[in-house]
Amino acid sequence: MLERAALLHRLRLPAHSLPFIYNGALFGGAKRSFSATSKRCTYEEEKAVLDELKPQLTADDLKHSKLLRNIGVSAHIDSGKTTFTERVLYYTGRIKAIHEVRGRDSVGAKMDHMDLEREKGITIQSAATYCSWDKDQESYHFNLIDTPGHIDFTIEVERALRVLDGAVLVVCAVSGVQSQTVTVDRQMRRYNVPRVTFINKMDRMGADPFKAIQQINTKLRIPAAAVHVPIGSESDLCGVVDIINRVAIYNEGENGEVLRKGPVPEELQDLVEEKRLLLVETLADVDDEMAEIFLDEQEPTVQQIKDAIRRATIARKFTPVLMGSALANTGIQNVLDAIVDYLPEPSEVLNTALDVSNNETKVNLIPSSHHPFVGLAFKLEEGNYGQLTYIRVYQGKLKKGGYITNVRTGKKVKVSRLVRMHSNEMEDVNEIGAGEICATFGIDCSSGDTFTDGKLKYSMSSMYVPDAVISLSISPNSKDSATNFSKALNRFQKEDPTFRVRFDPESKQTIISGMGELHLEIYVERMRREYNVACTTGKPQVSYRESIQIPATFDYTHKKQSGGAGQYARVMGNLTPVANSSENTFTTAVVGGRIPDKYLAACAKGFEEVCEKGPLIGHKVLGINMLINDGAIHAVDSNELAFKTATTAAFVQSFMQAQPVVLEPIMTVTVTAPNEFQGNVITLLNKLQAVIQDTENGHDEFTMTSECSLNTMFGFATSLRASTQGKGEFSLEFKQYSPASPQLQKQLIEEYRKSKK
């Protein structure tokens, strides 16, 4: 036990204070920084509101909520998420046999139901299921969503975390925290999702769980501590020690379904006590009640430790770390117990909506089946019986045969069929209560739409949708396929907000955009398989941006006389660059009514339109503020069109005088390969003019992180395979836009000018 003086010195607090240590983290598209105080206050405010709402819940509501968990499984690619989920389904009795992701029986994992997923051994779409787990003489109901690990399918993680109350973060014991682990962590913070962490692949050579925990603390910047110690290492792994209860747990039976408990092996007793003390220390840093116990030099009880873990986990100040191996059928049942013990029930999570009928005032949703219905459509999918809409019920009940209203469109629709999903299978139900996840057919809506009973006009915030970073032209090989080609593109756009389609009037080509080469490759292949449309694709195109480097003023007059009423508009102001901004802003400072508000609104519209297609190379404009501070009107000839045209022309004129620059996407490239190929990978990255940021050397593999222009990355997968004998893998993630090289800028500008002639 730490001495009182040492603890106070470490916490740097007066004796009457209670400690609170939390490392703030960057999160969200705007990279806002959250301090420890603001994060803590946010949770305390949530807790206070939840306590106020609790009396509105009936005894049935509380019991229903207590036995319900909505959780997701997220991780870096190849960390074993789907294998983990397969074991969860097996141990909960949801499936009768275990099938591997790349199994020999050609069945594949249950949650990877698409043929492409089973062929490639990756998860492409998030898949939902439900199962039950018995603990402490209660049966707990889990709504479980398995999400992709590849960055190209990040929207699947976004929409899953948007509607979930908790998550299991799977980390590889060998590779530790990887690039997509950091991305998933950022997404969990964005939606305030607490998590328990499972260190998987403990049976692999080079497994080092305590190094992984250290990386969780430093790279993810969230306090973490082990609640398990492995029994045996690598291929000799046979179980784990529960350090809270000081008991050894062994998985036995053909598939690890039999749990045997016993005393802690003698050779592990010192390590168990060391890690138990570290767990209590870490909890004292983040939980007030545990800090008081610590400061009073008391030995915490098992229940006090568990309660502290639950409080700190739900408050998003801490993550308990469990260990095992999904492939070796070890440690999975312990994670199911941890989901019950440490992740929140729906009534412990504050969800809000905006009251559209009352100036979008924020209102708190009550997870009670006796209140008016409010639900969010978070995912669309084409099923055998039409469009399948996944809905999270936040308040009230959703009944088969009932009517619900789409708040965005105002349309009232009938719920003709209500189902619970089990991957690609479904089970019909008559009603779904508050806090649950279900799916329904026959509802015309978009992803992110809010539904109510019709009396309420509530709108819930949707998920974060990142910008596309890569585009390519696409056309059907046969004119006879044009109808199916159009159907496929419309469906894919509706299902996936990161998949965009546009028609380029200059080249007369259809352009598809997405999150990466694999993302678009999958959709082209799905079009061939699901719609029998073979396509030809052009060379991938990078989504560049345009900006300026210095301010510029404008004083532009638009005049047009054509015999009758003409057009007249004068606008004055300036353009200024906004550093590190992902948005454009339009502001006005016109005094004395020299430009009426209706004309200023037209100016704003002109600004928005010209920013969609910049004057330099025809790509979107980024990081510019346009200010209009003066102007003039004509009593007869001025109108909205004239001011819109004047604004567009003034923008183009001043933009070209403000040292315009082409920005290109810079990607974070993470390469993992056997150690003997490290020199080859460095040579390959140097050829791409990549800037190497970090290298981590493991027992057998190394992980190298670098930053590189997306423009140089096409074909990198082939080059990496050749350089590593097919043993290397990599991931790409968008980092930022930066000025392109002068040669590339000149080339792009010349190509654009030629295309305009």
Swiss-Prot record:
Keyword Nucleotide-binding applies: yes
Sequence ranges assigned to domain tr-type G in this UniProt record: 66-347
GO biological process annotation, one example: mitochondrial translational elongation
InterPro entries per record: EFG_II (IPR041095), EFG_III (IPR009022), EFG_III/V (IPR035647), EFG_IV (IPR047872), EFG_V-like (IPR000640), EFTu-like_2 (IPR004161), P-loop_NTPase (IPR027417), Ribosomal_Su5_D2-typ_SF (IPR020568)
SMART domains reported in the protein's UniProt record: EFG_C, EFG_IV
Gene Ontology MF terms: GTP binding; GTPase activity; translation elongation factor activity
Binding site for GTP: 75-82, 146-150, 200-203
Keyword tRNA processing listed: no
Protein name as it appears in the record: Elongation factor G, mitochondrial
This protein's encoding gene: MEF1
